[in-house]
A protein has these predicted regions:
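N-terminal secretory signal peptides
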Residues: 1-8, 16-23
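N-proximal helix/coil linker or "cap" segments that precede and/or mark the start of modular domains
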Residues: 33-52, 205
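A short beta-strand-turn-helix
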Residues: 55-71
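Short active-site neighborhood of thiol/selenol oxidoreductases, capturing the structured segment around
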Residues: 69-82
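Typically the conserved alpha-helix immediately C-terminal to a functionally engaged Cys/Sec
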Residues: 86-101
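Thiol-based oxidoreductase modules, predominantly thioredoxin-like and allied folds used
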Residues: 99-127
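Structural micro-motif
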Residues: 129-147
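Non-catalytic, surface beta->alpha helical segment in thiol-disulfide oxidoreductase systems
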Residues: 139-140, 147-188
Length: 214
């Protein structure tokens, strides 16, 4: 927690505390879900999912594996003591519709922004998780980096420039799912996320459907 205090403003800390309180509600909803949607709690208290990538931490290989399986590759950045990360696991990923969609369409690699594990970036350069986070300009958690379905020779393969989209912080379940749909549909080729989201909301309203209140 000391690292978090040093890097968060007073306003951000208050927001984090509020999110933690809200997470108690999310936890109740999550654990009402079937067993297969419950997260795995690690010894350090952090959460993960049984279906996240079991990786050798070589990004080119993880990317190619996802591609060969017809999926998109994404990195989920977390850190110890992060209330929004907890909410992501106990609420968002505990909703069957969301979990099933992501599992079917994405390979997710979970990393720690302060982690010391060795990892190989897309350009073949080795470094720690912490260094990769800095290289990718990841400063807050949770952050999700989404990558293209294929790299061309003109595509920069390092840092933030390698992404096609980014989820910069905690998104509520409806927005969370929509972001994954946006990436899967290559919506980033046509419009920014907020426009894609707006069209989805308008479409639901036009057909008399309510926005899910997860």
């Amino acid at each position: 927690m000391e690292k978090i205090r040093k890097r968060l403003s007073r306003r951000e800390m208050l927001t984090a505390i509020a999110a933690g309180a809200g997470g108690l509600i999310g936890a109740k909803m999550a654990y009402a879900a079937p067993e297969r949607y419950k997260p795995v709690q690690l010894e350090n208290g952090q959460y993960t999912q049984s279906w996240f990538l079991n990786s050798f931490l070589e990004l080119p290989d993880d990317f190619e594996e996802a591609k060969s399986n017809g999926k998109r590759f994404a990195i989920l950045w977390e850190q110890d003591g992060c209330p929004y990360c907890r909410e992501t696991h106990l609420t968002n990923l505990a909703i069957p519709k969301i979990s099933d969609y992501i599992r079917s369409n994405f390979d997710i690699l979970q990393l720690d922004i302060w982690g010391g594990k060795g990892i190989v970036d897309f350009d073949g350069k080795g470094m720690t998780e912490k260094t990769l986070a800095k290289r990718s300009q990841v400063r807050f958690t949770p952050t999700i980096q989404f990558f293209p379905d294929a790299f061309s020779s003109a595509t920069p393969l390092v840092g933030k420039k390698a992404e096609v989209a980014r989820m910069p912080g905690y998104f509520r379940p409806f927005h969370f799912l929509t972001m994954f749909e946006y990436v899967r549909a290559r919506g980033y080729q046509h419009a920014p996320f907020h426009q894609y989201l707006g069209k989805k909301v308008s479409g639901l309203k036009a057909t008399g459907k309510e926005i899910p209140k997860w």
